[in-house]
Amino acid sequence: MKPILIWAIFILFCSVLLVQQTLLQDKSPIETNILALLPENQQDPLAQQAFNQIANNINNRVVFLLQGKNRDTLVQAADHFSENLIKLPLFNEVEAQISEADQQAWASLYFPYRAQLLSEKTKSQLQKSAASRVLHVVRQVYSPFAGVSGGELKSDPFLLFRDYLSSRNSSNSHFSLYQNYLLSSVGDDFYIVIQASLAGDAYDTQLQQQLPQLLALEASVEQVFHVKLLHTGTLFYATYGTESAKGEIGTIGIGSLIGVLLLLLLVYRSSLPLLLALLSIGCGLLVAFVVTVLVFGKVHLFSLVFGASLIGVSIDYAFHYLTERLMHQGEWDAKRALKKIFNAITLGLVTSLIGYLGLLIAPFPGLQQLSLFSIVGLSSAYLTVVLCYPMLAKSPSKTSPPNLMMLHRWLQLWQNKTLRFILPSGLMVVALLGLTQIQFDDDIRQLQAMPEALKAQEQKIKEVTGVGQQQTLLLVKAPSDELLLQRLEQLSRQFEQWEVSGEIKSFQAISQFIPSIKSQQQSYALIKSLYEHQGETLSKKLNFSEQIVFNHSFSPLLIEHYLSSAVAKPLGFLWLGSIGQQSASVVIINDIKNTALIENYLQQQKAVSVLDKGAEISSIFAHYRLFISEMLAAAYFAIALLLIWRYGFKLAFKILTPPFIAGVVALAITVVFAIPITIFNLLALLLVLGIGIDYTLFFAEQKQKSESANTLLAITLSAITTVLSFGLLALSETQAIHGFGVTVFTGIVVAWLLAPLAMQREHQIK
């Protein structure tokens, strides 16, 4: 069977797989979560689980805030909105009104254990003076606003349980219950909060496609009821990121294709070269997508953005073949033409693959996926040219070659020894001066385009609900659940002091809702003593007909009881439970004012660590930025050895110098534009190396001096296509992608400019 037939069958098979992967699956194979690019925290499984649990809870929830001047109109708007919200396929649960069952959940959970539950304030008062409790109860009973009933006095004569419940609910002080809605007022405005749980993953592109229905509902509610409706949640940021990335992929891909089409029509003036070029590009992207999904299960949007840029590399192989066909009409031989450029395009592929193979071994899913996509895409484009072009382009071109006078003049300048030395050296010196101002930035936020409108809504919702603008997560560990709760109580006492002194705004910990058994035993002893020593006094003060008797046995309230109750719905996700030999929980601190004080305290707590995913990711980026730098240096070294083996040291130096200088200049220009250098700028240098080597290799492989103009025409067409792609990429709203585009754009221009340096004066190949 002929190789071209085998390749055609393989491409057909990949096309079928593409349909199966995209159209016949319930979920899209395109991953949009930026965290999926990153390696998991291998050093601390507890930290990784903590982050996953917190992220899942946050990612799958949406918070709505209705704002209006009239309370009753606002309630009507909330009724209409919540009734229609649950009808949307976007959500599987809506929390609007607080049901009677939810309101009773607190009493249902805690009331059976009331003889062992005390707030810290009440516990302190009883330890100092139990007699003062009697006076407190008397004042409450005779107060017209306290609402103490006979039934409550019978079951809880010292009113300890109401104090305990009141202390647990203090976190909701920003809101009051109005017609079963959580209502808050700030100035002249009233606010109602509604929460909803997504019916899937916030990063699922199919789920994101349903967002317009929600936006239409919000607009309708605002128009009909004359209220303002704000929203926040990962869904909105993820959808914005997806749409931005898709738009950029479209801009890059379509922009590149339009550039290719115009160049092909302008230079070759025939449909066959156009179809052949599209064939090699299409096969490269098709096979790369299918193989990446097969290996990783999904393909990340970033890989697609980077993959779209491979058009500029893969088209290079096609341009050289098509230029040969255009310039040798009378003596055209399709197979001989392939043989003529075979060494150059093969070496070009090998040198490109050398750079990407190093990334394949990195324990970094994002780099592995990007590397695989690039390797498979370039190899497939190369095989399409080698296997298909000789069969599909047997007939000679009927188009007259373009006038190459300008290209001849440019090449003639390169015969000048002074230019061959001054231009590369001058660029190198200027670039090195620019690099003295280089700054590195590994902040994960450079990968996120954060729209101001969404950020403003999020800040407003946090302000009204009393949630901190900045949250710090702490991971607390202990050998058992009981010791963990004791440790959380110890931390909570310190945090409560900071809350009072204004060092922090607030905090949330599981120990605020479920005391340790040790704490329950202490409370039980205090309450029992209170009944025994002050029961008779209280009976006389209130003229009870029966003696107050303590008849409660101790039965511990356990973490399992709390987690299975509706009370745990807001914060139950903070409890991680047991992993291996450890139990763990997360504490949230809102708006730290005195950072130094808190950091100093936490450093002294051996079982407490800060869960800062942003800092962790930035550290990972810094590590792999160094790794890619080393891989880039290794790629240059390996390519240098390969070139010296084939061409000798002198010509190898001439081949490698242009892409090297291009990379240095590209970094310098990026720095001049005040763009910090990231891992993505270094990935851009890999691309500059691969494309730049292609340019110089074709000059080095020339057998005759007359071929130089043909070679320059081909690499000029390739460079224009690539520059067009990355010129558009540099317009990205995402800082990291913008910087990536600027680096590649500059590098390709300089690589093209210096490529004739590799022309041989003695046209002999070793």
Functional labels for PLM-detected ranges:
Residues 41, 100-266, 270, 510-644:
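Extracytoplasmic
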Residues 328-362, 704-733:
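Pore- and gate-forming transmembrane helices of large, multi-pass membrane proteins
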Residues 22-69, 172-178, 437-479, 696:
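Solvent-exposed, non-transmembrane loop/terminal regulatory segments of multi-pass membrane proteins
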Residues 294, 310-326, 342, 346, ...:
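Transmembrane alpha-helices and their membrane-interface boundaries in multi-pass membrane transporters
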Residues 1-29, 388-444:
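Signature of alpha-helical transmembrane segments and their immediate interfacial
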Residues 424-541:
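Juxtamembrane segments of multi-pass membrane proteins
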Residues 273-320, 651-698:
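Hydrophobic transmembrane alpha-helices and their membrane-interface caps
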